[in-house]
């Protein structure tokens, strides 16, 4: 039986969804960039890394975005909103990614060429809905890393999936292949977040044999 929690386990326990932020707190862009760069170690389908980030830290833009965000207060009062976008044409990055793997010595040329061919062939034949579903999954994975890294740096966050995605895409003139999927508010809390219960562990796990 594990008795003492690791630093990672404590961080995961302490991370909460915070919706009340101290207005007027500025997070240096260098810190946000550091969080997002470190988060890119997240896994993704075929390592195609379909995530893209749009950081909104201008107060007037956050105020305007609150309307598309169904009037959620934290969109305006947090220090910044990190919009996580999903590229549903992720297979077009296969060559760049795998060429870099060769350059860095991570894989031989023949394996990289196979990865490029397989990714371009398979993903280009998936439907747009299938590719979007893959991007959704990968965006969720990197978003979890973002909020844990933010917590480790002393900031609180909340992940939001409920916002007018069409209005967001129009406002920021996103290309058709970049789909807004998640908004992450980040900042300093104005009050502690509530704890939240979890289903009994025995209810959510079973072994196959």
What feature does the model see in each segment?
Residues 1-209:
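Acidic, surface-exposed loops and disordered segments
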């Amino acid at each position: 039986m594990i008795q003492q929690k690791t630093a990672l386990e404590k961080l995961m326990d302490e991370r909460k969804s915070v919706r009340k932020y101290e207005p007027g707190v500025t997070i240096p862009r260098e810190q946000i960039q550091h969080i997002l760069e470190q988060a890119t170690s997240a896994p993704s389908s075929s390592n195609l890394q379909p995530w893209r980030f749009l950081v909104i830290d201008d107060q007037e833009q956050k105020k305007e975005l609150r309307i598309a965000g169904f009037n959620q207060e934290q969109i305006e009062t947090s220090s910044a909103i990190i919009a996580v976008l999903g590229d549903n044409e992720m297979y077009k990055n296969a060559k760049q990614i795998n060429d870099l793997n060769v350059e860095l010595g991570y894989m031989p040329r023949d394996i990289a060429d196979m990865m490029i061919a397989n990714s371009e062939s398979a993903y280009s034949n998936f439907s747009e809905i299938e590719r979007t579903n893959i991007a959704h999954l990968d965006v969720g994975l990197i978003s979890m890393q973002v909020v844990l890294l933010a917590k480790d740096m002393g900031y609180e966050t909340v992940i939001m999936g409920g916002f007018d995605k069409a209005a967001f895409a129009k406002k920021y003139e996103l290309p058709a292949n970049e789909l807004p999927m998640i908004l992450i508010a980040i900042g300093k809390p104005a009050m502690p977040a509530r704890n939240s219960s979890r289903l009994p562990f025995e209810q959510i796990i079973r072994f196959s044999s």
